[in-house]
Amino acid sequence: MSFHWVDILIIALYLGLSIFIGFWISKKAGQSIQNYFLGGNKMKWYYLGLSNGSGMFDVSGTAWTVTILFVYGLQSVWIPWLWPVWNQIFVMVFMAVWLRRSGVMTGAEWITTRFGSDRGGRLSHIIVVVFAVISAIGFIAYFFVGIGKFVVTIFPWDLSFSLGGVTFINEYVYATILLSVTTLYVIRGGMYSVVATEVMQFLVMVVACVAVAWFAMDKVTPEQLDAAVPEGWYGFWPTWDKGIDWTGIFDAVNDKIASDGYGMLGALVMMMFFKGIFSSLAGPVPGYDMQRVFSCATPRDAAKMSGLTSLILYPPRYLMVAGLGVLGLVFVTPVLKAGGGEIDFEKILPWVINHMLPAGLRGLLLAGLLAAFMSTFSAFVNSAPAYIVNDLYKRYIRPDAPAKTLVRASYFSSVGIVVVGIIFGFFSESINSLTLWITSSLYGGYVAANMLKWIWWRFNGYGYFWGMVAGLAGSTLKFIFFPETPDIYLFPLIFALALAGSFLGCLLTKPVEEETLLSFYKNVRPWGWWEPVYRKAKALYPGITRNGDLPRDSVNVLVGIVWQMTLVVAPIYLVIRRWDGLAVSLALFAVTSVVLKFNWLDKIKDYEQV
């Protein structure tokens, strides 16, 4: 198809504005790496919240979410618990305050405040750096696959070429160009450019999401949708049997469900909840979410920023997802059935944009999805090099390096991470395979050690190191010996192996030095098994108080998970015109918002200085 000049103009204006803002604000970033990576801790929490929400609104994730809504209906809202999406609630309720009180720049630097600088502390520090860089490379590959699948069926120009006997297909060429353009302004302006462009990009995304939802509601009647979906598609609660049966409507979808491993969704949700509790207690992984927390001016601002992220992210995103999913069910299904052969459900999103949307709206949505891609990608490109520069180069190679040298090193490390991520993207099969690898296997090795570091005073750097190594080894063995088993079902085994490594590594070595533990507890004040440290701190600092917020935090987490779910389902109910479901979700949103207002927001506090 050919693009209308209006669509081209909208996309060109958006790209030009993004690059202009990124370069225009970049002068502040070069003053120091504190400015480059954290914005000097001077940016407002609501801008950081908008930036964080924008960074989580990615094209690959949107394409995947449209696909699972198409296949699983309302029950699909449970599947993102794989991450789990509600780890943001744990961060909002208590983890953001704990993290920000440390006053550091990266997760690896934070590890030093917890475990010290002895051999165990250095080992734990290094493995966090390795994990952060590997995670970033994995996500960049994930973005590479997603944006390639997306643009190749929309942009009409064939950019494929051959070089040295190797053919670079359209998907790879488009993805490489978009990654390169985004990397350019991120490298130049650091955190300032990332946040400024992401705020603008978020506004573009909101307009696009509302427009798509309105268009879908105008084009699809409830009767058309009823005829296009099987029995159970509107059901919210996960089932314990084989799930939705598409037989006679679209038989190929049953094969998709079988290959995903999401058939018995009820059992899967129980596994995801089990995994999610421990994953969330581990805290955010070393990445852009943690970087936004470290960038806030105060611990209270960090908590409010994390709460704002969920509030502004889910309603517009799921308006778009529901709109595109409904259009796909009614208008794309006949095309997919007629095509025969192997069906790539991850191309539902591009097909709807290509064939359904009118000029102007198509350009607006493309600008919005490009904004989603660029904001998410830029967040990773800005956060990962901090670990290379601050935690490797500055710490071990040139501790006395001037600010300009460190910023320049950040440029080179950003380019290196992007290049390696693109290379990995060439070898991944699909968005879903990368999603499962990142969430269930790679992060499975992360959970045990990072949970224990918060809640148990005796845990040390050796335990952290060997816990991470054991977990990552378990994840690797899974791919060798159980490649066909869904990753989520093997999480308990990987988690148990990581726990064993953590306890053995810890109990066979000496505890963290008392001075380090006292400093950490005095500053961070987590709840958990900290009684011996608290007693010693009380003797030194009579004014210190114990953190007794565990009961209230637990209630707020449960309320927050329900609150977050209402933000997901309400837009879907609106687009599919299920008014009873919409009314219930809005009522629950109102009730949970009031509870969080009085039991969380009004009680966020920084601890006294002692």
Describe these PLM feature segments.
Residues 1-610:
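Membrane-embedded helix-loop-helix hairpins and adjacent transmembrane boundary segments
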